[in-house]
């Protein structure tokens, strides 16, 4: 197998990092849904009632908003540190 050039290696690292981010995001969503399920679903049935659907939606939205706010703030701190 031929050795990778610097550009190929950088591209490979970028692709691996992107896949890791996707996997981390998916894991977070599953974790949020598990927490929200425990909080919102009293007794599972064949269908979710509107109250439960609203609770689940609001719960996940809160987690996502919080995560985005923390991530944005962290990025600002890192950017200021790099200047």
UniProtKB/Swiss-Prot annotation:
Gene Ontology biological process terms in this record: protein transport
Keyword Transmembrane assigned: no
Residues bearing the modification N-acetylalanine: 2
Keyword field: Acetylation, Chaperone, Disulfide bond, Membrane, Metal-binding, Mitochondrion, Mitochondrion inner membrane, Protein transport, Translocation, Transport, Zinc
Motif segment (Twin CX3C motif): 36-59
Keyword Acetylation among record annotations: yes
Subunit structure: Heterohexamer; possibly composed of 3 copies of TIMM8B and 3 copies of TIMM13, named soluble 70 kDa complex. Associates with the TIM22 complex, whose core is composed of TIMM22.
Protein name per the record: Mitochondrial import inner membrane translocase subunit Tim8 B
Gene that this polypeptide is encoded by: Timm8b
